[in-house]
Structures are given as C-alpha cells and as structure tokens.
C-alpha cells in the first residue's frame, strides 16, 4: 500500500489524496545519507523510520485526478495558509514536477526534500522544517509569478471568446494558479454528463454556454460525484416496502397505496415506476394468494376464515407464557402416567388369566411371566398335536361309516 499523508486543514481536498506519495530514484538512493550528513545543521539527522526505504521497493503510482476546487473569492488577494500548503504540495507531488522550474527530478534538492527525508511525516522538528521549506518554495513561486505578470500584461489581448487576462501583482499568482486549476478541471468529465438527471428532487438547471466548469463549482461545496450522490440517496430514502409495478397499473389497488405512491414516487422515463407504500403490519400474510385470485363462494370462504381463526388460536396457545407451558407439560405427564398404570394393570390381569388356563402353573400364584409364557407355548403345541390326532381319527371313523353304509345297502338289495 503506498504511503500517503494529509496535512491538518479544514479544506475538503485534504480529506482524500491531495498529497501524493514520493519515491526514490534508483541512482540517488546511495547518496541519500551522504547528502543528509553534508546538510548538517540545516536538516535533522535521519530518523529511525528512514530504513523503511531500504527495505521496501515502492512501485510508481498513476497520476491522481486533477483537483476540482473552485476559484477563490475575488476580495481575497492572498491565499490562506492551507491553500498555500496545498499549492506547494500539488507542485511537489503532481505531474507538474517534471515540467516546472521549482524542482527537477535530476536535481539533488529533490532528494534532499524534507518530505522525502521523513517518510512518515512524524515529529515536531520535521513539521517545522517542512513549514520552512514550504514558505521558501511559495515565496519563490510568487516572485516568479510577479515577474511573469507584467510580461503577460504587455502581450496582445486574447480573443473575446477566451477568459479575461488575470491582473498583475500578488493577485496574478493566485489568478494564474487558479486558471491552471480551471484548465485541469475542464479536462475532467462533468458529473452532469454522466448523470443527466440528478438523484435529488430538484430539477436540472441548464448551465450557461460560456461558463467555466471550475467557476460553476462553489467555494465551500465539494464537487458532486457518484459516491456523494449515492450517499445522499441512501440518507434520503426511508423505504418500508418497495414495489416495482408496470405503468398501466390495475385498478384494484387501494386508495391508500395510490396516495402514498403519488406522494413518494419520483419521475422516471422508463415504463416501470418505483413506488413506496406503507403496509399495515396486520395485513402481512405471506401465505395469502396473489391479487388475481378467484373469488370463492360464501360457504367456502367461511370455512377458510374459520380455519384461519383456528390456526391463530393454536398459534396463540403455542406462544403462551412459560407458566402455561409448564402447566401443560405437567398435565401431559400426569395423563401419561395414568394411562401407563392402566396398561400395566390390564397386562397383569391378562397374565393371570393365561396362568389359570395352563394346568402346570394354574395353582402357582408366584409364577413369573417368563415361566407362564413358556408353559403356555408348550401347552399350545401339545394342544395342536392332540388336535391333529383327533382330526385323523375322525377321518378314519368317517371312512368306516361310509364303508358300513355301503355294505348295508348291498345286503338290502340281495334280499329283495
């Protein structure tokens, strides 16, 4: 992450990235400490944090966007202290370093800068040295602007379509500097081109044809960007329910929702309309059918209503207090115990009845259940074997009877 610092100022540009990071050139890294020792009393000795530059190799960063600050008031001839610091820092850190006469990348003074000397901008002595360097650079800059002022005034006037020439003297430096800022701002994209219809409720006002983009911006108001407009939209909106409906909405919508939509709807050029309506809490029914439902008969409607009432009652019972829940659990436990006792009594009586049917354990009142079941199984098997024997004997007797009947019939026929 590149190192950056911001001076303590109330200007809004210092809240962002007005001060760019600084980097060493490869051929000048070796002479850094040597140059610092030669300066002696002019600058402070190297801080412990300066070893960071030897450990990390920072990559160059792309140029930052030009500042969109507005022009200063006409009454102020000299810029404020914060504006002076901003002017010097922009000249030190921007792309103008390679093109201006203040410092040259090949010059040794660029490496000896107090800003590069203290990479973290820490310490009160570094701040004092920085203020001293800034004041010297600003004085040199203003002197060069004052020298260039009369020369600019002696030149022929620009065509009527161009901006008027700035005045000479101390105001010339500020005027030319702000003129450069206006030219840099003119190269930027106007937010009104990207957002022809702003997100706020106000109607877009047409700008004059010859207006300068830098002059259109207020002194105290920062430029309108997409991030600012998004934040304003988030702060202004208080949406309870957002519904996206067609422009030709059905006539079955209620009057309350229509009034709410008329009050809160914003103009939009698409066939879809964004509406905000306040829905009553008691009308929230997620299981309800859509608006295009078929009307049910009266009897079926009554059944549905009664079913809903029963569901609500059951839900209310479920959502009762903890005391009622405890009482219900106790009742259920008591009922379960009673039913379990009855079941055990019935089972015991059935075992007693089974014991009485088995001859071997009929008189044994203390016979366990396992013995009763085992003897009962044996007794059932013996009864089944006896049954099979009796069935076979019965079949033999039936055949003997048939044989005897046949013999009797033959005797009767022989006598006749």
From Swiss-Prot:
InterPro entries: bHLH_dom, HLH_DNA-bd_sf, Myc-LZ, Myc_transcription_factors, Tscrpt_reg_Myc, Tscrpt_reg_Myc_N. GO terms for molecular function: DNA binding; DNA-binding transcription factor activity; protein dimerization activity. Residues 144-174, 203-267, 314-336 are annotated as: Disordered. This is Viral myc transforming protein. Residues 212-227, 245-259 have a biased composition (Low complexity). This protein is synthesized as a Gag-vMyc chimeric protein. The sequence shown here corresponds to the Myc homolog fragment of the chimera. It is found in: Host nucleus. Residues 383-411 are annotated as: Leucine-zipper. One of its GO terms (cellular component) is host cell nucleus. Residues 228-240 have a biased composition (Acidic residues).
């Amino acid at each position: 992450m590149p190192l950056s610092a911001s001076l303590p100022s109330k200007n809004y540009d210092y809240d962002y990235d007005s001060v760019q990071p600084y980097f060493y050139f490869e051929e000048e890294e070796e002479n850094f400490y040597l140059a610092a020792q030669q300066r002696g009393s002019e600058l402070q000795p190297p801080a412990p944090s300066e070893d960071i530059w030897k450990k990390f190799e920072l990559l160059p960063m792309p140029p930052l966007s030009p500042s969109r600050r507005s022009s200063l008031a006409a009454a102020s001839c000299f810029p404020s202290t914060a504006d002076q610091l901003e002017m010097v820092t922009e000249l030190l850190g921007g792309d103008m370093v390679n093109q201006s006469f203040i410092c040259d990348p090949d010059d040794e003074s660029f490496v000896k800068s107090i800003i590069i000397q203290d990479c973290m901008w820490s310490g009160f002595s570094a701040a004092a040295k920085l203020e001293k360097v800034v004041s010297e650079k600003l004085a040199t800059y203003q002197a060069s602007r004052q020298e260039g002022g009369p020369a600019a005034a002696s030149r022929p006037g620009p065509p009527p379509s161009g901006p008027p020439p700035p005045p000479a003297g101390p105001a010339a430096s500020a005027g030319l500097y702000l003129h450069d800022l206006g030219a840099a701002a003119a190269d930027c994209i106007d937010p009104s081109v990207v957002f022809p219809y702003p997100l706020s409720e106000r109607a877009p006002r047409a700008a004059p044809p010859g207006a300068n983009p830098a002059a259109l911006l207020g002194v105290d108001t920062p430029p309108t960007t997409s991030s600012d407009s998004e934040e304003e939209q988030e702060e202004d909106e208080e949406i309870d329910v957002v519904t996206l409906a067609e422009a030709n909405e059905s006539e079955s919508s209620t009057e309350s929702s229509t009034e709410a939509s008329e009050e809160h709807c914003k103009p939009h050029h698409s066939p879809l309309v964004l509406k905000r309506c306040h829905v009553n809490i008691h009308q929230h029914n997620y299981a309800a059918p859509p608006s295009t439902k078929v009307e049910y008969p009266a009897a079926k409607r009554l059944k549905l209503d009664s079913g809903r009432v029963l569901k609500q009652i059951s839900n209310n019972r479920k959502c009762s207090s903890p005391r009622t829940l405890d009482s219900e659990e106790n009742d259920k436990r008591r009922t379960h115990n009673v039913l379990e006792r009855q079941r055990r009594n019935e089972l015991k009586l059935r075992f007693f009845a089974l014991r009485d049917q088995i001859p071997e354990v009929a008189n044994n009142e203390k016979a366990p259940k396992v013995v009763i079941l085992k003897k009962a199984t044996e007794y059932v098997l013996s009864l089944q074997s006896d049954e099979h024997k009796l069935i076979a004997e019965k079949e033999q007797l039936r055949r003997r009877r048939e044989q005897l009947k046949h013999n009797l019939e033959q005797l009767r026929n022989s006598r006749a």
